[in-house]
């Protein structure tokens, strides 16, 4: 797997390395995690190595492809003096070992190959043309450039091992490039906006072996036995029987990001961070794998030799890893990972701390109670069914009361998700709801009504593919207006938060000044008492003495020991 928007997540082929970066826009580095099954894939932070792109005048945000190559390295060779990482030391001696290499593809034609820990650059390959796509297979790197030329390169050599020009898809916009395997035979997958081509590069003149007319495809994979080709687009996962003239035999409604197989299991990483597992011949998914607390799976890799899958999921910008056996997936319909009681205890402690802080802020506490009352209010099942039926009928009748239905107090978040999944079955209904919500939010992005943002959130999450397929100009125009409104509110929000922070600081400063003033008043009273007592001790003896320099003023101020505001010259006084 390569990069997805702002995220880098990629397992090495042997599942012993994982490249990760949660935010390439903010950080110009990638972390390499060493993975060890004997340690249950728990990684000590001291073993994580970092690739700093800035030291070589590169930007990780420019990289369009991340992948891994692997090769058998002769450990006895005098030409290779590479120190084994501490986490890989097993005490066993062997003449060869598998070494991983981290591959980065830049759009300007550069391919930079790093060592397994990222500390060294092994090779830099420079292609004359812009790179459109890339993939890796064992020690080989396959690239597609802007001339629609496919090249096979080795990670440690700059000279291509094989080169050929595409025939099918040459004049189309290519959106995805991938290497596939069918019963041990390497094939090249070319995906355009309307077609999928599977090319056999083994012949002297590479030819197209399969072609499928399918729009907006995102990933392809052969079944483990090579009999079926699986193609995922924005709306569904489709299975074609290659023995029956590439006949479509089955499809599942799911939005897929990554597609892989393990035995007869079809594993699909969905756009909402779950793994759905399917089998040919079964209408429903066999098993769903999710992460507790609404966290997301970012990548996975099947380990065929061990009959298990290794999963990486994101927890507070750090990857966590867990392996699940094939037997568990086939026998359990639903698997939840990250069941950690300690995390729950930490959250409970944090909640208690927040509650204590809010006790000193009556306004915040009152606002919180009002919000909780709105969210946690009990809604009867009959009310939920009734409002769902009313909304469905209004969608059919094109009623003007759709907005009132969406903002009804009978809706809960689970019911909103259920309605979107089960009741919105046509593009027309989807378009009506989206237009209604987008218009209302565009007019007032700061509306305190929390139901419309919930509707928008789950529409974009569950129906993003269908929304993207709507070609209606009116819908696209409303979408642009919505983006503009949300963008302005997004820009204003940090300013408002800053003002809120300053006001809170001023409030605390005023309280501090008040406390300091009271403290100063108390100290002043104590000092006044002490000064009065001290002056009495000094002035009484002076009043008893007949000192020539002592002079009483009309205001009864006593000057002692020559302390006067008049200068007296001693010589003149003597005369």
From Swiss-Prot:
InterPro entries: WD40/YVTN_repeat-like_dom_sf (IPR015943). One of its GO terms (cellular component) is nucleus. The modification Phosphoserine is found at residues 547, 564. Disulfide bonds: none annotated. Residues 340-355, 364-375 have a biased composition (Basic and acidic residues). One of its GO terms (biological process) is maturation of SSU-rRNA. Keywords: Nucleus, Phosphoprotein, Ribonucleoprotein, Ribosome biogenesis, rRNA processing, Transcription. The keyword Transcription applies. Its main location: nucleus. Residues 340-375 are annotated as: Disordered. It is found in: Nucleus, Nucleolus. One of its GO terms (molecular function) is U3 snoRNA binding. Gene3D superfamilies: YVTN repeat-like/Quinoprotein amine dehydrogenase. Interacts with snoRNA U3. Interacts with MPP10. Component of the ribosomal small subunit (SSU) processome composed of at least 40 protein subunits and snoRNA U3. In the absence of snoRNA3, forms a complex with other t-UTPs. This complex can associate with pre-18S ribosomal RNAs. Involved in nucleolar processing of pre-18S ribosomal RNA. Required for optimal pre-ribosomal RNA transcription by RNA polymerase I together with a subset of U3 proteins required for transcription (t-UTPs). Present with 20000 molecules/cell in log phase SD medium. This is U3 small nucleolar RNA-associated protein 9. It comes from Saccharomyces cerevisiae (strain ATCC 204508 / S288c).
């Amino acid at each position: 797997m390569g990069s997805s928007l702002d995220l880098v997540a990629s397992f090495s082929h042997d599942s012993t390395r994982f490249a990760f970066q949660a935010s390439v826009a903010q950080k110009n580095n990638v972390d390499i995690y060493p993975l060890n099954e004997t340690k249950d894939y728990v990684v000590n932070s001291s073993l994580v190595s970092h690739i700093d792109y800035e030291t070589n005048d590169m930007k990780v945000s420019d990289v369009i492809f991340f992948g891994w190559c692997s090769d058998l390295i002769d450990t006895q060779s005098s030409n290779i003096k590479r120190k084994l990482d501490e986490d890989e030391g097993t005490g066993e001696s062997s003449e060869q070992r598998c070494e991983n290499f981290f591959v980065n593809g830049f759009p300007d034609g550069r391919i930079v190959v790093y060592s397994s820990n990222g500390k060294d650059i092994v090779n830099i390959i420079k292609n004359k043309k812009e790179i459109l796509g890339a993939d890796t297979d064992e020690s080989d790197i396959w690239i597609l450039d802007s001339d629609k030329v496919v090249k096979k390169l080795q990670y440690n050599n700059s000279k291509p091992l094989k080169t050929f020009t595409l025939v099918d898809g040459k004049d189309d916009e290519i959106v995805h490039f991938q290497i596939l395997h069918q019963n041990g035979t390497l094939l090249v997958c070319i995906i355009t906006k309307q077609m999928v081509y599977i090319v056999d590069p083994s012949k002297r003149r590479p030819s197209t072996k399969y072609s499928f007319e399918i729009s907006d495809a995102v990933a392809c994979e052969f079944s483990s036995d090579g009999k079926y080709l699986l193609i995922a687009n924005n709306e569904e996962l489709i299975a074609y029987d290659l023995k029956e003239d590439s006949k479509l035999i089955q499809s599942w409604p799911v939005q897929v990001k990554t597609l892989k197989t393990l035995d007869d299991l079809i594993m699909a990483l969905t756009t909402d961070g779950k793994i759905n597992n399917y089998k040919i011949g079964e209408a429903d998914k066999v098993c769903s794998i999710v992460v507790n607390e609404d966290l997301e799976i970012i990548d996975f890799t099947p380990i065929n030799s061990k009959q298990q899958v290794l999963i990486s999921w994101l927890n507070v910008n750090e990857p966590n890893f867990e392996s699940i056996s094939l037997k568990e997936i086939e026998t359990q319909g639903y698997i939840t990972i990250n069941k950690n009681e300690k995390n729950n205890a930490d959250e409970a402690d944090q909640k208690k701390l927040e509650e204590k802080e809010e006790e000193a802020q009556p306004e915040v506490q009152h606002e919180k109670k009002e919000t909780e009352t709105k969210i946690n209010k009990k809604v009867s099942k009959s009310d939920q069914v009734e409002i769902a039926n009313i909304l469905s009928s209004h969608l059919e009748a094109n009623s003007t009361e759709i907005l009132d239905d969406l903002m009804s107090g009978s809706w809960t978040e689970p019911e909103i998700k259920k309605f979107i999944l089960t009741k919105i079955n046509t593009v027309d209904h989807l378009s009506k709801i989206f237009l209604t919500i987008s218009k209302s939010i565009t007019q007032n992005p700061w509306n305190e009504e929390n139901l419309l943002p919930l509707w928008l959130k789950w529409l974009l999450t569950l129906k993003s593919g269908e929304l993207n397929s709507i070609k209606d100009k009116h819908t696209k125009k409303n979408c642009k207006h919505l983006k503009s409104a949300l963008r302005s509110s997004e820009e204003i929000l940090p300013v408002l938060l800053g003002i809120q922070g300053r006001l809170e600081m001023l409030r605390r400063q005023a309280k501090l000044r008040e406390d300091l003033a009271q403290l100063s008043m108390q100290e002043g009273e104590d000092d006044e008492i002490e000064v009065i007592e001290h002056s009495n001790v000094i002035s009484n003896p002076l009043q008893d003495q007949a000192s020539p320099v002592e002079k009483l003023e009309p205001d009864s101020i006593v000057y002692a020991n020559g302390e006067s505001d008049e200068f007296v010259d001693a010589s003149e006084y003597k005369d």
